[in-house]
Regions:
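Ligand-binding clefts of soluble mixed alpha/beta catalytic domains
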Residues: 1-232
Length: 232
C-alpha cells in the first residue's frame, strides 16, 4: 500500500521508539522520516543482534539514534522531543499539497523584490537559501548529511524545493541526496531551484568509489531530466 501511495499523497514516518528491520524499511518508504529523541532509533538490526555478531556492546542510539540516522541519510529530521517531532511533521505538511493533483498551500507573506543585504558576501548554502526564501520559511532536509543542502521553503508564498550542491568536487553521496529530493519535489509539482557551486565530480583512488560516483551521476541526471516540475 505504501509503495502505491508513494508520490501520490505525502507520507511522513515518525520514529518515536526503536524501529528495527522490516519496520525500518517501511519507514523508509515514506517521503519524510522524522526521528525523535531520546528513544527513537532507526536500525536494520537491534543492539542485541549486533552485539552478538560484533562481540561488543553497542547502544541503539549509536546504531540509529536521531542524530546518526540524519547524518547517514536514513532520516530527514532529528528532533529533541516527541512534541518537537509532531511540530516538525505539521510544518512539513504545511509545505506540501494534500495529493499530487493539488497545489501546495499558498500565502503571500513577503515581497520577492526585496533587496538582499550582503547576499554576495560569500554565504554558505544554507544561508543562501535562507536569503532567497521568505523569512523563517526554510525547512532543511537531512541537515549534516553531506555538504549538499536540500530544503523546502517559500518564495512569495509558494513552496519551492531548494538544492545546493556544496562547494568543491561533488561525491556520490551528495548526488544521491539531491536526486532523491528532486524526485520528491517533482512528485508534488514543487518547482526546484538549484544553486550550483561545484567544481566537478570527485575522483577517488578506488575503482569501487569511482563507479559509485558514475552511478550516482547518472541517477542525478535522470532525476532532473525526468522531472516535469519547474526547474531554475
Amino acid at each position: 500500500h505504501m509503495a502505491r501511495l508513494s508520490g501520490v499523497v505525502p507520507m511522513i514516518a515518525m520514529v518515536l521508539g526503536p524501529c528495527v528491520g522490516a519496520a525500518a524499511m517501511m519507514a523508509k518508504l515514506s517521503d519524510v522520516v522524522i526521528v525523535a529523541k531520546p528513544a527513537g532509533a532507526l536500525m536494520m538490526a537491534g543492539p542485541q543482534v549486533l552485539a552478538s555478531a560484533m562481540k561488543k556492546d553497542i547502544k541503539a542510539e549509536e546504531l540509529g539514534g536521531a542524530d546518526v540516522a540524519v547524518k547517514t541519510g536514513a532520516a530527514h529530521f532529528a528532533c529533541e522531543t516527541e512534541a518537537d517531532a509532531m511540530a516538525k511533521a505539521k510544518a512539513v505538511l504545511g509545505m506540501l499539497p494534500a495529493n499530487n493533483l493539488e497545489d501546495a498551500p499558498f500565502s503571500v507573506e513577503e515581497d520577492m523584490n526585496r533587496q538582499l543585504e550582503g547576499f554576495e558576501a560569500g554565504c554558505d548554502g544554507a544561508e543562501l537559501i535562507a536569503a532567497l526564501a521568505d523569512a523563517g520559511s526554510v525547512l532543511e532536509f537531512g541537515k549534516g548529511h553531506t555538504q549538499a543542502v536540500t530544503a523546502l521553503g517559500k518564495m512569495a508564498g509558494r513552496t519551492v524545493a531548494f538544492v545546493y550542491t556544496g562547494k568543491g568536487d561533488t561525491c556520490d553521496n551528495r548526488m544521491k541526496k539531491i536526486a532523491r529530493f528532486v524526485r520528491f519535489a517533482d512528485c508534488y509539482n514543487i518547482p526546484v531551484v538549484s544553486l550550483v557551486d561545484s567544481t566537478g565530480l570527485k575522483l577517488f583512488d578506488t575503482v569501487e568509489r569511482q563507479m559509485a560516483v558514475l552511478n550516482a551521476a547518472s541517477t542525478l541526471v535522470y532525476a532532473y531530466s525526468e522531472a516535469t516540475t519547474g526547474k531554475v
